């Protein structure tokens, strides 16, 4: 019971050490990833992992919950206060679990769901045919304008009037612009639908006022706690009080059994951090970094190489890069950036002719680098490196760029001394 991981399971300890090294010495630019603070790591690696706590605070199906009840109430209160919501459920294990609970609370199987098409930036849980949301419900989709790559609210309204959904979704996985929540609310009211907003990607920006809040407009809002919010991987549901009972029942017993109390403790810590001036500064640098990247990738030398930015820029923490007119496909560009030490993910772009495992685009995000402390100068340097890779292709000096990336990463150390604490048991 007291032996450290390195002694009990050296194979896993070695792999954890290697992953720590990878995170330290590369530049993480996957838009859905971030680095949690050590305080969150400590909470999620705590003795709370031992406790079963089915039910809600004060109404558990297990004894011995007097302390975890307080933990969960703190997390719920912090979530409500941070986002100005009537109620919060902090039990979902993930964003997908949160989304499933929302749909089960608001709809019955066979009813109609309208969301952003996956090929235009939507999420799997917004009605993709192979996902539970596409199997249980009749799904319809709206897309983006073929020229501007923006969501046309007149087109959304027309589709909603035609399709008459029970639930209208506003949210995305790869869309670089702010959504018009008031317009979505108006359309939902016109067709008699409930409005669900999935703010998983931009919740951190909402928390500090850098992005409009969907909470005043939506019936229910779901989010992850990682991504821009910077906590551990998990989900969260907010909304109007009238939906609290249905949401709570859809989470437990509808979707899950016992909540992960160690993860809920980590959520509570992350939600407290989100109220600090340091967190606001981080979100400001996240947004500034994305705009620096978008500006660099719309410069003449980059566009001459056939690279473009979807919608021409960004309002959020990510840039969606279109490579259809360049020598690259998404997989090849991802692989070459990986060689120089920058981690991104290939992503479909609107009207993408390539299959999803290849794609014609990249989704590049700035939250993790902002968390490390990157500012304008560093984001400018990173943007130049990415531009060099995408414009020079096979002739790029990988070794030189890798050295530059390693220097940048080591200028902003990550988790100093963590291997001693996490692997050796100190």
Swiss-Prot record:
PTM annotation (N6-(pyridoxal phosphate)lysine): residues? 227
| EC numbers, comma separated | 2.1.2.1
Q: Which reaction does it catalyse?
A: (6R)-5,10-methylene-5,6,7,8-tetrahydrofolate + glycine + H2O = (6S)-5,6,7,8-tetrahydrofolate + L-serine
Keywords in alphabetical order: Amino-acid biosynthesis, Cytoplasm, One-carbon metabolism, Pyridoxal phosphate, Transferase
Which residues does (6S)-5,6,7,8-tetrahydrofolate bind? 118, 122-124
> Transferase as a keyword?
yes
Give the location in the cell: Cytoplasm
Question: Top EC class per UniProt?
Answer: transferase
What are the residue positions of the site described as Plays an important role in substrate specificity? 226
What InterPro entries does the entry give? Answer: PyrdxlP-dep_Trfase (IPR015424), PyrdxlP-dep_Trfase_major (IPR015421), PyrdxlP-dep_Trfase_small (IPR015422), Ser_HO-MeTrfase (IPR001085), Ser_HO-MeTrfase-like (IPR049943), Ser_HO-MeTrfase_PLP_BS (IPR019798), SHMT-like_dom (IPR039429)
Its domain of life reads Bacteria
Q: What's one GO-annotated cellular component?
A: cytosol
Q: Which PROSITE patterns would you find in this protein's record? A: SHMT
GO biological processes:
glycine biosynthetic process from serine; tetrahydrofolate interconversion
What family does this belong to? Answer: Belongs to the SHMT family.
Write out the function statement from the record.
Catalyzes the reversible interconversion of serine and glycine with tetrahydrofolate (THF) serving as the one-carbon carrier. This reaction serves as the major source of one-carbon groups required for the biosynthesis of purines, thymidylate, methionine, and other important biomolecules. Also exhibits THF-independent aldolase activity toward beta-hydroxyamino acids, producing glycine and aldehydes, via a retro-aldol mechanism.
- Subunit structure, briefly? Homodimer.
Q: Which NCBIfam families match?
A: PRK00011.1 (NF000586)
HAMAP family reported in the protein's UniProt record: SHMT
Protein name (record): Serine hydroxymethyltransferase
Which species does the entry assign this protein to? Mycobacterium leprae (strain TN)
Q: Which gene encodes it?
A: glyA
């Amino acid at each position: 019971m007291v032996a450290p991981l390195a002694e009990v399971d050296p194979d896993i300890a070695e792999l954890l050490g290697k992953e720590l090294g990878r995170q330290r010495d590369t530049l993480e630019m996957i838009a859905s990833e971030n680095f949690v603070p050590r305080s969150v790591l400590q909470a999620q690696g705590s003795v709370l992992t031992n406790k079963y706590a089915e039910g809600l605070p004060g109404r558990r199906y297990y004894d011995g919950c007097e302390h975890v009840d307080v933990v969960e109430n703190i997390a719920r209160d912090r979530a409500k206060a941070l986002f100005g919501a009537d109620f919060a459920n902090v039990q979902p294990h993930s964003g997908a679990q949160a989304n499933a609970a929302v749909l089960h609370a608001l709809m019955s199987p066979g009813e109609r769901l309208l969301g952003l098409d996956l090929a235009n930036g939507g999420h799997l849980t917004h009605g993709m045919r192979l996902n539970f949301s596409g199997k249980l419900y009749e799904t319809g989709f709206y897309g983006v304008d073929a020229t501007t790559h923006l969501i046309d609210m007149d087109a959304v309204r027309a589709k909603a009037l035609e399709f008459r959904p029970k639930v209208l979704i506003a949210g995305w996985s790869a869309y670089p612009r702010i959504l018009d929540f008031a317009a979505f609310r108006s359309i939902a009211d016109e067709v008699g639908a409930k409005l669900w907003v999935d703010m998983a990607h931009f919740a951190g920006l909402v928390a500090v006022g850098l992005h409009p809040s969907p909470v005043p407009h939506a019936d229910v809002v779901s989010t992850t706690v990682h991504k821009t919010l910077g906590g551990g991987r998990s989900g969260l549901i907010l909304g109007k009080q009238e939906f609290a009972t249905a949401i709570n029942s859809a989470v437990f017993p509808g979707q899950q059994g016992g909540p992960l109390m160690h993860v809920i403790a980590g959520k509570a810590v992350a939600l407290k951090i989100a109220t600090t001036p340091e967190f606001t500064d981080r979100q400001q640098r996240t947004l500034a970094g994305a705009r620096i990247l978008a500006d660099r990738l719309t410069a003449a030398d980059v566009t001459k190489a056939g690279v473009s930015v979807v919608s021409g820029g960004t309002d959020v923490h990510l840039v969606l890069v279109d490579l259809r007119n360049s020598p690259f496909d998404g997989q090849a560009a991802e692989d070459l950036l990986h060689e120089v030490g920058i981690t991104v993910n290939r992503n479909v772009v609107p009207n993408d002719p390539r299959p999803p495992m290849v794609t014609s685009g990249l989704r590049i995000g700035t939250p993790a680098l902002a968390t490390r402390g990157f500012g304008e100068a560093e984001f400018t340097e990173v943007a130049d490196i990415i531009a060099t890779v995408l414009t020079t292709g096979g002739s790029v000096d990988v070794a030189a760029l890798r050295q530059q990336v390693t220097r940048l990463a080591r200028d902003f150390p990550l988790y100093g001394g963590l291997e001693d604490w996490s692997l050796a048991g100190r």
